[in-house]
Amino acid sequence: MKKLNELGDGSCGTIVAITVDSHFQSRITSIGLTIGSRIEVIQNPKKQPVLLYNRDTMVALNKNEAEKIMVEVRQ
């Protein structure tokens, strides 16, 4: 299990935990990021937002948000 912000470009996995406050929980739920969601990291540059693909949608999360999402990486 890894934090979303630790995954490299092209990594795929399933969200297994989200440790955030209720405001952020509401925001990410509204864009489809929930426990059990399958994601693919499109880009994860060092000082820019993480760009990922989830449920036919591209989503950008800043590093602080991404580090609060735990992902089970698929090989």
State each model region's role.
Residues 5, 25, 46-53:
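Short, Lys/Arg- and Gly-enriched loop/turn segments at beta-strand edges
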Residues 18-21, 55:
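A structural micro-motif recognizing beta-strand termini
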Residues 23-27, 37:
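Short alpha-helix capping/helix-loop boundary micro-motifs
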Residues 31-32:
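A short glycine-leucine-enriched loop at secondary-structure breakpoints
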Residues 48-75:
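C-terminal structural segments of small proteins and small subunits
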